[in-house]
């Protein structure tokens, strides 16, 4: 099965300026992400960026880069520009790999692509079980509920589904029904072309979750349970230190 991995890599970051070029074990973070995507077996791995320094780092590492505009509101919009610039066919499977996930397992990059190829949804993603009550009630951990076929019913920052009987007694323990959404997506290129023409939905603006636009317009998202949990993503300087420590413990200094 053939698929293309695209890594949106925005240079500007409020909490961590120049994040794609942050040094991790002697290499820029974006190069680590690119290597993980290449190990997934993707036919092509393309870094989409708006900054010449990121372009230079990717080319220096032997990667493929596509320069995009700087005014995109989301990674999906940047993805759509790459789809048009590269002229991908509507049936081509595109995996959106977050540019701040240097520890993402190659296995799950391939898994989400294979998941999309097997179903009739325009979009597929992954989730992992939640076992900790604090995570279930953390608004930064996005929860998802699915139907009997694995299609998303809703994504929320709230604790869903609400276990009425259990939580009436205590909210310190949760059952086995919670899933945390992982921010990796697979789409067919034709779906991306349609998606960027849809106006933002009320629900996505309330929850600040872009994927809710898909459900709002009546499209399906298939959600599989990830074969492997993703590693630490990099949003803050503390996250960056954590990733550096993990790789150092693995002998990458």
Curated annotation (Swiss-Prot):
Reactions it catalyzes: 3-deoxy-alpha-D-manno-oct-2-ulosonate + CTP = CMP-3-deoxy-beta-D-manno-octulosonate + diphosphate
Pathway noted in the entry: Nucleotide-sugar biosynthesis; CMP-3-deoxy-D-manno-octulosonate biosynthesis; CMP-3-deoxy-D-manno-octulosonate from 3-deoxy-D-manno-octulosonate and CTP: step 1/1; Bacterial outer membrane biogenesis; lipopolysaccharide biosynthesis
Cellular component GO terms held in the UniProt record: cytosol
Pfam family, any one: CTP_transf_3
EC number(s) stated in the UniProt entry for this protein: 2.7.7.38
Location of this chain's protein in the cell: Cytoplasm
Enzyme class: transferase
BP term (GO), one: CMP-keto-3-deoxy-D-manno-octulosonic acid biosynthetic process
Classification via InterPro entries: Cytidylyl_trans, KdsB, Nucleotide-diphossugar_trans
Domain of life of the native organism: Bacteria
Keyword terms: Cytoplasm, Lipopolysaccharide biosynthesis, Nucleotidyltransferase, Transferase
GO molecular function: 3-deoxy-manno-octulosonate cytidylyltransferase activity
Ranges annotated as spanning the membrane: none
Function in brief: Activates KDO (a required 8-carbon sugar) for incorporation into bacterial lipopolysaccharide in Gram-negative bacteria.
Family indicated by similarity: Belongs to the KdsB family.
Record's protein name: 3-deoxy-manno-octulosonate cytidylyltransferase
């Amino acid at each position: 099965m053939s698929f293309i991995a695209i890594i949106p890599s925005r240079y500007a970051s409020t909490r961590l300026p120049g994040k794609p070029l942050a040094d991790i074990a002697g290499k820029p973070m974006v190069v680590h992400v690119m290597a993980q995507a290449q190990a997934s077996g993707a036919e092509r791995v393309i870094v989409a960026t708006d900054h010449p320094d990121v372009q230079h780092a990717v080319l220096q590492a032997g990667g493929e880069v596509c320069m995009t505009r700087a005014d995109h509101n989301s990674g999906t919009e940047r993805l759509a520009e790459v789809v048009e610039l590269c002229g991908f066919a509507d049936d081509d499977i595109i995996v959106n790999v977050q540019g701040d996930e240097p520890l993402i397992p190659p296995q799950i990059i391939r898994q989400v692509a294979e998941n999309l190829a097997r179903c009739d949804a325009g979009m597929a993603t992954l989730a992992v079980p939640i076992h900790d009550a604090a995570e279930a009630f953390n608004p930064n951990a996005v929860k998802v509920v699915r139907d009997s076929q694995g299609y998303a019913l809703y994504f929320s920052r709230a604790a869903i589904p609400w276990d009425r009987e259990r939580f009436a007694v205590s909210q310190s323990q949760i059952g086995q029904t919670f899933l945390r959404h992982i921010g990796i997506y697979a789409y067919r290129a034709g779906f991306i072309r349609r998606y960027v023409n849809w106006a933002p939905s009320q629900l996505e603006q309330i929850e600040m979750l872009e994927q809710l636009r898909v459900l709002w317009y009546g499209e399906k998202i298939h959600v599989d349970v990830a074969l492997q949990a993703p590693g630490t993503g990099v949003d803050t300087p503390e996250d960056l230190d954590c990733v550096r420590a993990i790789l150092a413990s693995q002998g990458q200094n």
